[in-house]
């Protein structure tokens, strides 16, 4: 039984949690509150870009796809001021280009360590460049097997990947369309946008502006920045313990669900069933989409979601119906879904908050 906000209830034999992305995490910065008047905690809110002075300055926290989206949206709405983009490493998404197909080079005998996989990928990139190819071909070749690679890694190696490789993987895997990349490049080269590598350390809000302290990654010097607005562009929150959502909170509090061991979503079994606090898969609660990232890693983009939904539908029909109709499996299709062919910045991909 599912209780809705208006007090009504729904009764179902199975419930699929397909909540999509949640708002960005709260930034644990001295002086900063999500209620601060000049701070925008979620760039996806309807009023996120309202009342920003057209000739003022804006600080975007995070340098992934979300910050690119916001920067482009600001300029589209006539913003003529300066855009500061701050993230720990100052890495921006790479630009997508049309490429040829690179042969699959990962197999069951490939390394099961982060370091070994890095060596393998770098060797393929060198081979591509020596043969007048492109590193993008190598990265794209991994897409059909990324979930298999993730599942093959022990927990310790998954953690090592998240600590050391994730930011670099994200900017190469989740690229931006050439026309969007050209706009961002022009903003930077014309002095209308600046990308900083560092960490925000303090926030002070005044009646007409904001002052932030941040530590420069290269020099380790403390710096001061004055802006009119600060926007959280760090991407969706994935740690379910921190998600401010009544449904997620209720599932955790009642023991119907538990976080995965990497805190990238909820723990699920291979069929997508939620695993409760005792470690038992639920017979009626399932998950679909980004909330399964901990077990699949690639669980955001459209091709993977189509396949995931098809597999889950087949499983549920097989379990709930006495004589279910045969379902034709949906194969992942990346053709036609590249960023080069999309009008928006994203290729239905995930935000990378740690770049």
Positions of PLM-derived features:
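Flavin (primarily FAD) cofactor-binding/catalytic cores of flavoenzymes
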Residues: 1-115, 119-322, 332-347, 351-355
């Amino acid at each position: 039984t599912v209780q809705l906000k208006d007090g009504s209830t729904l009764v179902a034999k199975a419930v699929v949690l397909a909540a999509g992305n949640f708002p960005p995490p709260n930034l644990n910065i001295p002086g900063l509150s999500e209620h601060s008047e000049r701070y925008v905690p979620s760039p996806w809110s309807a009023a996120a870009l309202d009342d920003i002075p057209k000739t003022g300055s804006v600080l975007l926290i995070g340098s992934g796809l979300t910050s690119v989206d916001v920067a482009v949206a600001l300029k589209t709405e006539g913003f003529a001021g300066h855009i500061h983009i701050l993230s720990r490493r100052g890495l921006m998404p790479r630009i997508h280009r049309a490429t040829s197909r690179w042969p699959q080079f990962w197999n069951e005998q490939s390394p099961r360590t982060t370091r070994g996989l890095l060596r393998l990928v770098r060797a393929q990139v060198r081979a591509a460049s020596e043969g007048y190819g492109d590193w993008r071909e190598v990265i794209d070749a991994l897409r059909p097997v990324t979930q298999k690679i993730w599942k093959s890694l022990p927990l310790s190696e998954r953690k090592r990947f998240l600590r050391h490789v994730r930011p670099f993987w994200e900017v190469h895997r989740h690229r931006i369309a050439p026309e969007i990349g050209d706009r961002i490049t022009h903003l930077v080269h014309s002095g209308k946008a600046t990308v900083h590598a560092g960490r925000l350390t303090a926030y002070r809000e005044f009646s007409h502006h904001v002052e932030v302290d941040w530590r420069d990654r290269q020099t380790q010097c403390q710096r001061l920045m004055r802006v009119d607005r600060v926007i959280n562009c760090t991407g969706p929150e994935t740690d379910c313990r921190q998600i401010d959502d009544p449904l997620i909170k209720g599932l955790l509090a009642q023991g119907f669900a538990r976080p995965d061991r990497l805190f990238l979503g909820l723990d699920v079994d291979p069929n997508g069933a939620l695993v409760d606090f005792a470690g038992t898969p639920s017979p009626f609660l399932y998950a679909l989409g980004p909330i399964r990232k901990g077990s699949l890693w690639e669980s955001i983009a459209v091709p993977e979601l189509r396949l995931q939904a098809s597999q889950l539908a087949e499983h549920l029909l097989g379990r709930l119906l006495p004589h279910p109709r045969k379902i034709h499996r949906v194969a992942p299709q990346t053709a036609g879904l590249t960023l080069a062919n999309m009008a928006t910045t994203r290729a239905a991909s995930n935000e990378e908050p740690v770049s």
